[in-house]
């Protein structure tokens, strides 16, 4: 946006970032007041670094250079600085800049503080600078580098772009296009994954913890929270395998803390703590939390868990306190869990290879150690989830409550669990999803190797708890369903189902297919389980009734079924004796048969639920295997069906990134940047020639139309376009409505066109639209009329939608949705997902249409939407798909300024 030709300060370029070592920094555009800090940065640099940057020794920057470096226009001359510390203690630790050379390219330069080398600052700044340059219509970066500057050369080479190099007179010129490549996307995702996983590892595996307790005059609730977490920290694990605990308590320690077992180091103030700590836990009033974080910064904690409430969940004042807390923490290199967090539990192998237990939570009774990782957000839900897992004896490796989710979220936790050797299955209870686009990307990566079970608060996922920072969304709730389906997670409807599915995935192998054998001790129970299996989309390969009072017969039948892998993929066992209790030999027989066969098995046995010793046996390798027990046959079958769907997704072809010919992304960005250059706030609708030019950049040809006022102009237009033609009203609610008289088709000669013009004007008089002009367009071949849309949603990012035009879309909302970027498989599935889809494949004698051509148009819209966040709304309507080819007959494109939540650069919440 410009004001009187001057580009406004790009606030949306500011961001907190996670670095390679898990620490944080702040990135923002440079401003004139940075001159002194930039000079200090320069003076601190070594002679070698200065020579690499300026190709000459330069002890101080001349005043003219300082002005030129800090006074930029944020369009043709852009500079970003990475900042450590806050307020008076701010330090510039890296600088990146570009200067436009011509309409397409700019020269870039980077300089990283000597004492911050190796933290990935150059890579992060390159990502952010590239996004800014693309926003300004640039397509290529060049840089002049000394050949011996290996670190800077590596930044360019390792970014994943197609880099060209030229050595001339001792200077290496490096250049590359800015359009993201498949490789550059992979590199960014890998770097993001490693940085965020490392930041979480530093937080979840502390060797030392500092708990700061509220003062005597503060809320008693905060003191009770502190008492609980200290007691749990010092009481978890054995000496040498639990963290060292420091407590800052300005009041007299209460009895709970004084009586806690284990060694404690007590101090009256933060300033008395003598040495660095890994983790900070706050139980202080919201109003003082940011100050406490600033005072603790010298101790260099990697993260802070905020147990206290009183932040964003209580309103605008609390939100301001939360943002102040976040700024202070990130400035000191800390990640934030909370506020209003229940804390976290870690039961697993630490970085040093030893098993450790850290209970930095409010939970007194923990589930036993195991292979399930759990995340929820608010504290009340944490209580129920942990207690349910404990009662079922489902072992937990990590439990994390993100509270208000001001910083650390489910995305960060999934990054950590992807490589966590202690975790096999992940369960998420999400009251909100702050960055759905990133969630989809991270979850898909995790789900490729570990099952992810997801429960959202409200089936729509649009329920927003107090304190959760979530952007508004315009998309229908089906978009969230599609996002979860794309990402490969297992969607469940209740906490009960989450643990039902998790206990199966932790303890049983994935089913190889949908064929299920049912074994029960009565025919009615067998029928009940079989009906539940069929309703859940499973194939009942057979059902058997075996007397429950004959454990040997049960084991023999199960062994025979489970070893017949050509006929059965899973087994459901139901045993409910009508007289007396369950014979202990029956579950032992079930366990032995399941362990020996390796076939996925679930059981509903009276008196057993969860993970029980009665249903545990050793497999051929001596590894204990447990058959999960369920309260009802339907529960067992639903859990099994979820595992079957996940197994099918994991083994299916999930597609490849779209690679399309004839795409001019740089040209499209220049067109959009030029059109947006002098645009104010609000939505800008492109004229048809502009829309056609933008679509042409992506290989989409918009059929031309001519606006006419009368019959003579209509005939002249038809002569230019070619006969036969269609005549359309330009009224928005009539332009696609043949049934309302807004469209006349197959007009083959001047006489029919003149008659249609007169008749339509008379007819439209009843709608009050008689004075509107008409559109004339050449007729396409007969085919199915479709609608393709894209929209830049504030929360979901680029959402692409598809449907068959008419009442299926207008009245029934029959559209499929996908979150860009799509794969080729995503595109195929979107077209086949709509209920009216059979019309495309030869319905009731109609010839099948050219679905491949339709897929190509949808794929091109997906790439456009992913590339151009400024495209606020796009609609292709109709897209007529015939037996050969697809014709785009109408298009509307709207542009608007935007700040995409997941824009191809690493950012943290702020």
Regions found by a protein language model. Give the residues of each.
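Catalytic-core regions of core metabolic enzymes
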Residues: 183-910
């Amino acid at each position: 946006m410009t004001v009187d030709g001057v580009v406004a300060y790009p606030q949306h370029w500011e961001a907190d970032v996670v670095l390679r070592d898990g620490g944080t920094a702040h990135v923002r555009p440079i401003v004139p007041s940075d001159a002194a800090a930039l000079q200090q940065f320069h003076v601190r640099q070594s002679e070698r670094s200065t020579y690499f940057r300026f190709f000459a020794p330069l002890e101080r920057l001349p005043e003219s250079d300082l002005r030129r470096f800090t006074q930029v226009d944020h369009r043709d001359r852009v500079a970003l600085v990475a900042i450590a510390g806050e307020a008076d203690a701010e330090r510039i630790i890296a600088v990146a800049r570009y200067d436009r050379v011509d309409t397409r390219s700019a020269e870039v330069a980077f300089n990283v503080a000597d004492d911050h080398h190796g933290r990935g600052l150059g890579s992060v700044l390159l990502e952010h600078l590239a996004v800014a340059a693309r926003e300004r219509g640039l397509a290529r970066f060049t840089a002049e580098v000394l050949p011996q500057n290996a670190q800077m050369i590596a930044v360019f080479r390792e970014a994943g772009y197609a880099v060209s190099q030229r050595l001339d007179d001792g200077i290496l010129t490096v250049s590359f296009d800015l359009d993201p490549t498949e490789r550059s996307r992979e590199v960014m995702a890998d770097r993001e994954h490693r940085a965020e996983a490392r930041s979480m590892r530093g937080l979840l595996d502390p060797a030392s913890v500092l708990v700061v307790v509220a003062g005597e005059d503060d809320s008693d609730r905060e003191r009770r929270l502190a008492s609980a977490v200290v007691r749990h920290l010092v009481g978890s694990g054995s000496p040498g395998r639990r963290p060292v605990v420091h407590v800052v308590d300005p009041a007299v320690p209460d009895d709970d803390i004084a009586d806690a077992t284990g060694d404690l180091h007590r101090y009256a103030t933060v300033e008395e703590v003598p040495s660095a700590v890994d983790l900070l836990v706050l139980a202080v009033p919201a109003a003082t939390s940011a100050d406490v974080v600033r005072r603790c910064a010298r101790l260099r904690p990697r993260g802070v868990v905020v147990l206290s409430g009183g932040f964003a969940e209580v309103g605008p004042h609390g939100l301001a306190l939360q943002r102040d807390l976040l700024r202070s923490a990130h400035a000191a290199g800390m990640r934030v869990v909370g506020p209003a967090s229940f804390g976290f539990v870690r039961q697993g192998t630490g970085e040093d290879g030893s098993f450790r237990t850290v209970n930095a939570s409010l939970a007194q009774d923990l589930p036993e150690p195991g292979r399930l990782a759990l995340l929820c957000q608010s504290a009340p839900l944490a209580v129920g989830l942990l207690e349910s897992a404990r009662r079922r004896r489902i072992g937990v490796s990590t439990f994390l409550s993100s509270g208000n989710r001001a910083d650390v979220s489910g995305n960060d936790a999934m990054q950590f669990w992807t490589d966590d050797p202690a975790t096999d299955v992940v369960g998420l209870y999400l009251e909100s999803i702050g960055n759905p686009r990133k969630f989809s990307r991270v979850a898909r990566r995790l789900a490729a190797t570990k099952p992810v079970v997801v429960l959202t608060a409200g089936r729509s996922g649009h329920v927003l708890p107090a304190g959760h920072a979530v952007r508004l969304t315009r998309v229908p709730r089906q978009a969230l369903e599609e996002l979860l389906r794309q990402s490969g997670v297992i969607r469940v409807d209740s906490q009960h189902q989450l643990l039902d599915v998790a206990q199966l995935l932790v303890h049983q192998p994935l089913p190889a297919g949908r064929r299920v054998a049912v074994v029960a001790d009565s025919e009615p129970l067998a029928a009940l389980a079989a009906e539940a299996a069929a309703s859940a989309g499973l194939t009942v390969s057979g059902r058997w009734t075996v007397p429950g009072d004959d454990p040997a017969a049960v084991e023999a039948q199960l062994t025979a079924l489970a070893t017949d892998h050509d006929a059965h993929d899973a087994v459901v066992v139901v045993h409910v004796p009508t007289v007396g209790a369950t014979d202990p030999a029956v579950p032992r027989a079930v366990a032995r048969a399941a362990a020996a066969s390796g076939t996925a098995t679930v059981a509903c046995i009276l008196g057993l639920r969860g993970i029980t010793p009665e249903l545990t046996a050793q497999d051929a390798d001596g590894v204990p295997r447990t058959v999960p027990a369920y309260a009802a046959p339907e529960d067992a079958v639903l859990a099994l069906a979820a595992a079957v769907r996940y197994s099918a997704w994991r083994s299916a072809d999930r597609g490849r990134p779209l690679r399309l010919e004839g795409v001019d992304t740089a040209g499209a960005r220049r067109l959009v940047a030029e059109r947006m250059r002098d645009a104010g706030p609000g939505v800008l609708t492109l004229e048809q020639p502009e829309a056609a030019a933008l679509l042409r950049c992506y290989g989409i040809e918009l059929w031309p139309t001519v606006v006419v006022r009368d019959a003579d102009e209509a005939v002249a237009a038809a002569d230019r376009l070619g006969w036969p033609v269609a005549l359309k009203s330009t009224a928005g609610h009539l332009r696609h409505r043949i049934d309302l008289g807004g469209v006349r088709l197959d007009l083959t000669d001047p006489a029919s066109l003149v008659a249609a013009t007169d008749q339509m004007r008379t007819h439209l008089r009843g709608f009050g639209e008689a004075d509107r002009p008409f559109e004339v367009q050449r007729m396409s071949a007969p085919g199915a009329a479709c609608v393709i849309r894209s929209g830049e949603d504030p929360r979901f990012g680029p959402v692409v939608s598809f449907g068959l035009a008419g009442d299926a879309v207008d009245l029934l909302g029959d559209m499929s949705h996908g979150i860009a970027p799509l794969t080729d498989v995503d595109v195929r599935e979107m077209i086949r997902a709509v209920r009216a889809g059979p019309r495309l494949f030869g319905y009731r004698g109609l010839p099948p249409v050219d679905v491949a051509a339709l897929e190509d148009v949808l794929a091109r819209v997906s790439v456009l939407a992913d590339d151009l966040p400024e495209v606020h709304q796009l609609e292709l309507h109709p897209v007529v798909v015939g037996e050969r080819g697809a014709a785009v007959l109408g298009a509307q494109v709207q542009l608007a300024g935007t700040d995409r939540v997941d824009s191809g650069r690493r950012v943290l919440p702020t």
